[in-house]
From Swiss-Prot:
Record's comment on post-translational modification: In purified enzyme appears as 5 forms, each differing by about 200 Da of a covalently bound, negatively charged residue. Not glycosylated.
GO CC, one annotated term: cytoplasm
Record protein name field: DNA-directed RNA polymerase subunit Rpo4
Catalytic activity: RNA(n) + a ribonucleoside 5'-triphosphate = RNA(n+1) + diphosphate
UniProt keywords, alphabetically: Cytoplasm, DNA-directed RNA polymerase, Nucleotidyltransferase, Transcription, Transferase
Organism listed in the record: Sulfolobus acidocaldarius (strain ATCC 33909 / DSM 639 / JCM 8929 / NBRC 15157 / NCIMB 11770)
Subcellular location: Cytoplasm
Keyword Nucleotidyltransferase carried by entry: yes
Pfam families, alphabetized: RNA_pol_Rpb4 (PF03874)
Any one GO MF annotation of this record: nucleotide binding
Amino acid sequence: MSYSLKTIEEHFVPYSIAKKYIKELIDTGSSSNLIQKTFDYLNSISRCDEDSASKIMKELEEIVKREDVRAVLASICPTTVEEVRSVLVIDPSTIYSTEQIQKIIEIIKKYVES
């Protein structure tokens, strides 16, 4: 089976949203061993559902400008200052205050699965 795809837009997405898209591929029969293994891996590491990840991404927009950084935060859902700081180093051009980091943690904790 051969597909011809054209990329119209490109976005960074959290793990749980990627998992949703891969599940759609599997459900339509467009699966392979690699796709199945990727789905299984994402299923094992997702910390929140796709709706919660989308909400985290949206709420973080006012604090974290870069989409790639928001996607990593919504994927791994860090809950300590140190964990958040370890992600924020991805964007060395922005300095985040302790207050901003605490707000990031509050947003994530609203949606993270226990």
